[in-house]
Structures are given as structure tokens and as C-alpha cells.
Amino acid sequence: STTDQRAAFLEEVATQIDARGAEITAIGIKETGLPEARLEGERGRTVAQLRMFADHIKIDAHLDHRHDKALPERVPAPRPDLQLFQRPIGPVAVFGASNFPLAFSSAGGDTAAALAAGCPVVVKGHPAHPGIADFIAQAFDAAIKATGVHAGVFNQVNDGGHVVGEALVKHPLIRAVGFTGSLRAGRILFDIAAARPDPIPFFGELGSINPMFVLPAAAASRGMEIASGWAGSLTMGAGQFCTNPGIAVMLDGPAKEQFAKTATQALTQVVPQTMLTGGIAKAFQDGCTAMFNELGVEALIASDNTGREAGPQLFTTTASNWLTRPALQVEVFGPLGILVIAKDMDEMRAVAQALHGQLTCTLHLDGGDIDDAKTIVPILERKAGRLLANGFPTGVEVCDSMVHSGPYPASTNFGATSVGTMAIRRFLRPVCYQNIPNDFLP
């Protein structure tokens, strides 16, 4: 297909999804328990993402064209004409996510990026929202008919369990995989992709605790404000965001006491929320139980959790204890936070240094924190795909500059991103054309 054909197809898919907006929202409320406003907002993000990639390829931004012209008179040896273009890698398998039934599922970022690159897509729909996936498939079918693109450009299988997922990754025609989900499931599929006779890239977005570092001056001047914001970010969507800020790190002292009190008060006001699936709720309950059983960890808030309902949980521990307990770095998917108390900046830097790979790391700082921040930012740059100052990570902007990945276990490929226009690069590979006539160039 040509770039113009692909762009028109992506735009038509967006139009067809919008045309089914009411039905998608209605079935989504029943399947996921998510509120209407959340589903409407996520649908807007999804169609905007499709149109963003259409605009991106219309100007050939994805081709990364580079041209070193021939130098036939160069001595001691002439240079041939050399041109580089990015080319599609082939069929891509995409796994729908449980927590974003639209933006990270059948028509989500992985699918949009792969189609924009020129790669056919096979989606494995998530069992948590088959009705939404069905409407999205209808939108794709209508867009295929309206634009005349090849009928095989989009295919979807709904559920089928682990057997279907593993078979998809093993299929010899699949050239790459996009995945958003748990560390356990993602690592199994990653290993399968690597064990193939012809290993393929597995772009997995897996687990992250997204730490916040509250530096001393900021803690003293606006600790209550930061604590309230943390509580809101921690419980947004029942904590079911991959960018949920699971730990806050700060120094011991009066500011810490006020921070803990404010966060506790704010979280106490949050009513239990319905989690997306029974499996996610059970995993959250197990994570809370494990946290209660960790030595040196004190519960500040311990909500009762029954069925699919999840109330906020808040724990605290010392940095010295956190540093000796690897289990405290394991993501608990849900509204659970840990306040980690360091005795001094050296210990705070030790926490930063000990972090596994993260999607995000956040600094809360004021003017008096600049010198301390300069010693911690170089550490965090090596730990995360996105660094924030004086904000909260649960909003992920879809734009050219966004990076949504990080070192393992945040993702399986720290040089890529699953959000933003650079996400298309996962499904392209560079090809150099030497002295090839223009008739054969992309």
C-alpha cells in the first residue's frame, strides 16, 4: 500500500470508531465497570492517535530518509550513491490490554503504529472486554470496505487463552509483537519470541512502580499539596494505570509527618472502586497481603477489599529497610502506595540507585532543591523513560516527544516507546539502497 492509502485508511478507522461511539461506551460500561466519561475520553484519545499517525506518514516523517550522493571523482576511492529508508518489517501481533480497552487494545497505539508503518496486524483481544473489541473489529471492516485496502490488513482473534497467544508469537509469519500487560505473562511471551528459530522483537510494556522523590525544600513549603496530589494520582481509575506512582521517597522530619498525615486523610476519603476483572482484584488482594507480611513495613491505611472492590492502601517503611527487601519493588497493580523515609540525601540517592527500570520517575523540587536534584537526576535518567518535575505521572500525552517505556522490567526494549509518533519505529527497519535507480525507491 502507498503512504496516502494507509493514511486514508487510518483516518477512516477513526471515523468508523466515532460512528460507533455510543455502542462502544454502552458495552464498555457493562464489561469493565469504567464510567462513561472515562470511556468517552479514552475513545477520543484512540481516534486522535490514529489521526496523528496518519498525519505523521503523510509528510513521510517515518521514512527517516538519508541521502549520501555519489562522489565519482573522490580519491582514493569513489563513493557510490547511498540512500537510507525505513521499511515495514511485516505482520505484527498485538495483545490487547485489560486496563485500556480502547487506547491500548484493538485500535490502540501498537495497532495504529504498525498499520502506519505498513505492517498488517493480528490482534489478540483481551477477554475483559470482548464486546468493545467486536465493535472495533466492525469499524475496521467498514474502513477496509470504504477505502479498498487489502482485507488482510487487520485481523482479530478474541481470547483463546494462553494457547492462542503463544501460537501467535510462534507463528513464522509474525515479525514483531506489541504487548501491554503483566510482567509474568509478558516475560513468558518475550522468552517465546526469543526462542524462535528466527527470534523476533517483543515490545512489551510490563511493570513499573513509578517512584516520586519529594526533595526537602518542596516538602517543607508545599508537602501537603504534594501529598494530596499523590493520593489523587494513586487512586485514579482504582490505581489501574501502568504509570501509577506507587512509592514516594522523602527525608525524615516534620515535613514527613505532615505529608503522611495529609496523604492518609486524603486517601481515607476515597471510596472503594470496582477493578476491571476478578483476576486483577485477586492479584491486588494478594499484593496487599504480601505487603502486610513484609517485616519493617507499617500500614497507615488498610482498606477492606472484597470481590472486585478495591480501597486505597498506604504503607510506610524506612529507606534502609526498603533497600534490603526486593519484594517492595514489585508492582502491586491497584491503589496502593508506599511512603519510603530516608535519613539523609545519601540514603535517598541509594534508593534511586537501587531502582529497577521504570516507566517514569518524578521529582518534586523547589528553588532550594536544585543542588540536590542535580545529584539525583543523572541516576534517574538511567532508570526511566520519562522524568517529571512537580507533577504526577498518570497522564501520558500522545505527541512527538513522549516516551512510554524504560529499562526492564518497565519494558523489554528501552530504546522504543509505545506512545507517541516514535512508536512507529518499532515496526520499521532501515534499508540502504546503493546505486538503486529511483524507480525502485520507496
Feature roles, as predicted:
Residues 99, 128, 161-163, 174, ...:
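Short, glycine-/Ser/Thr-/acidic-enriched flexible segments
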Residues 307-310, 345-441:
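C-terminal core of ALDH-fold dehydrogenases
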Residues 61-231, 253-256:
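Rossmann-like NAD(P) dinucleotide-binding subdomain of oxidoreductase/dehydrogenase enzymes
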Residues 1-80:
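N-terminal Rossmann-like NAD(P)+-binding subdomain of aldehyde/semialdehyde dehydrogenases
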Residues 168-173, 216-222, 288-289, 312-313, ...:
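Short, surface-exposed amphipathic charged segments that create phosphate/polyanion-binding patches used
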Residues 9, 117-132, 153, 198-216, ...:
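Short loop-to-beta-strand entry elements in the cores of soluble alpha/beta enzymes
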Residues 228, 250-359, 371:
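NAD(P)-dependent aldehyde/semialdehyde dehydrogenase
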